[in-house]
């Protein structure tokens, strides 16, 4: 499957500006900058399990089926309902405060999150 794999954080753009726009306090933004994030994606057709492990042992995991409403949670643990879509090979989700697209480009997982005119990009390299 196109998305299945384990990915390790490699680089990011506009982290500070995006996190400030989310309303996170400075100390939380600073701590998050040093996180080593491992993303693991399991894809079975239209069904996904998308997990992110953060330094310190915190894990966020969302299960969803493309085109069907599901309950998801944000990095902060807030639960919300969303319908995840597939558009042009990209997984597209509307989080409560931002729009996110994810795609695999070569051996990289590229995640783009947008709030208004601020775009955050996180790139992770495939480990397995």
Curated annotation (Swiss-Prot):
It is a peripheral membrane protein. The modification N-acetylalanine is found at residue 2. This is Gastrotropin. One of its GO terms (molecular function) is lipid binding. GO terms for biological process: bile acid metabolic process; lipid transport. Its main location: cytoplasm. Keywords: Acetylation, Cytoplasm, Lipid transport, Lipid-binding, Membrane, Transport. Binds to bile acids and is involved in enterohepatic bile acid metabolism. Required for efficient apical to basolateral transport of conjugated bile acids in ileal enterocytes. Stimulates gastric acid and pepsinogen secretion. PANTHER family: FATTY ACID BINDING PROTEIN. The gene is Fabp6. It holds the Pfam family Lipocalin_7. Belongs to the calycin superfamily. Fatty-acid binding protein (FABP) family. Forms a beta-barrel structure that accommodates hydrophobic ligands in its interior. Can bind at least two ligands per molecule, however, the stoichiometry is debated. One of its GO terms (cellular component) is membrane. InterPro entries: Calycin, Fatty_acid-bd, ILBP. It is found in: Cytoplasm; Membrane. It comes from the Eukaryota. Expressed in ovary granulosa and luteal cells.
């Amino acid at each position: 499957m196109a998305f299945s794999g384990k990915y390790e954080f490699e680089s990011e753009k506009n982290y500070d500006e995006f996190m400030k726009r989310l309303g996170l306090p400075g100390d939380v933004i600073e701590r998050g900058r040093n996180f080593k994030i491992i993303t693991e994606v399991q894809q079975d057709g239209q069904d996904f399990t998308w997990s992110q492990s953060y330094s310190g042992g915190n894990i966020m995991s969302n299960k969803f089926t493309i085109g069907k409403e599901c309950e998801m949670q944000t990095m902060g643990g807030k639960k919300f309902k969303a319908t995840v879509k597939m558009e042009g090979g990209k997984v597209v989700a509307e989080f409560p405060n931002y729009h996110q697209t994810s795609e695999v480009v070569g051996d990289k997982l590229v995640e783009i999150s947008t709030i208004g005119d601020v775009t955050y990009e996180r790139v992770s390299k495939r480990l397995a």
